[in-house]
Amino acid sequence: MTVEYKKRLLHLLLDLGEAMLTTGAEVNRVEDTLSRMGQAYGAEKMNVFVITSSIVVTMSFSEGDEYTQTRRIQKPIGTDFQKLEQLNALSRKCCEQVLDLQDLEKSIHTSCQETKDRTYTHIGSILAAGSFAIFFGGTFADGIIAA
């Protein structure tokens, strides 16, 4: 493995970790996923530390070289279980059969690019607001105004 390959791998692992974290994955899951993927790609030892605003990854290889990189997470953390499931499936696939880095990069960015249809979210918000207004003693007109 070349130095450039290892650096690119580390960068892609951070991309994956950031994508998982910002779509709602818990911190332990991100740490475990990045550790397993790094070892699947040839790292002898992985040291991964994740909090909601930062990811630190150190990869140690059998040749004796180590690479460390930190990524600050500034994107808002939301919940998108569909994207999270795609990223989890990608990580499982990579642990079973190692993908080429170019394919890995394409898969990560494809999963992150897909946009979520917010129509159902808006309809649900309207129904919830109107229902709560009526539930807490408002009239039907209050429910419509709240929606």
For each feature predicted by the language model, list its residue ranges.
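Cytosolic juxtamembrane amphipathic/interface segments immediately preceding
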Residues: 105-113
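Core alpha-helical transmembrane segments of integral membrane proteins
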Residues: 115-147
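Soluble N-terminal domains of membrane-associated systems
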Residues: 1-98
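N-terminal loops that bind phosphate or other acidic moieties
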Residues: 99-106, 136
